[in-house]
Amino acid sequence: RKYAEESSTSLANAYFEIVFGTPDMPRITEEDITASGTDTAIYVIARASGEGKDRTASKGDYYLTDDEEYNISLIRRRYAKVVVIINGGSVIDTAFLKSQNVNSILVVSQLGNVGGHVVADVITGISDPCGRLTDTWAKAYDDYPGKDDFSSNNGNTDDEFYKEGMYVGYRYFDSFGVEPAYPFGYGKSYTDFDIAVAETALDGEVFSAKLVVYNTGSEYAGKQVVQAYVSSPEGSLDKP
């Protein structure tokens, strides 16, 4: 209530502004680096995500802030290994991270109250990062076909009408040959897997397959996400 009064806004707007707000990230100093006494830096990029808010093409939202770029550039020069953790439930721009050649990027999404324990287990090798992306991470904001329909871009906050039709997510990128930064289903592991097709069957309109997944690594246990994709033959109907 106090924030709403000071900001001359409604209680509802005040609630969402606080929830979706992200505190400013201080700049890392040489004193911080000296005091760390390690050759590895772990840097966390935090983004709020939730209902009723699309990514905006602005710094601190889809793009990194000036302070985030400064910090990442500094630690990349001063540390032998740099791990970037993206703590947020939606995509952000990764072009700067790639330009800095960070050693790894760990997307943790929104893990809830046990998120810290989970991240610690993955970083220390207790658990394998077996998850895969459920979104397509584009190389550029303009590559998303629905960007013009985002409420932050067209000002329509009451009703939203997206025009991609069936070409949502990876369907658009795959169908129209738009190369993403990271495709739908992308992910790396501490180990390697081989997948063998043991049996396939077609019963009417139902297709089934039995697979055998082998962990071919020698050091880490892990889980593999089996992904199957179907493409439709070209015809008179619009199909991905």
Task: Name each region found by the language model.
Residues 1-240:
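C-terminal non-catalytic regions of proteins with extracellular/luminal or membrane-system context
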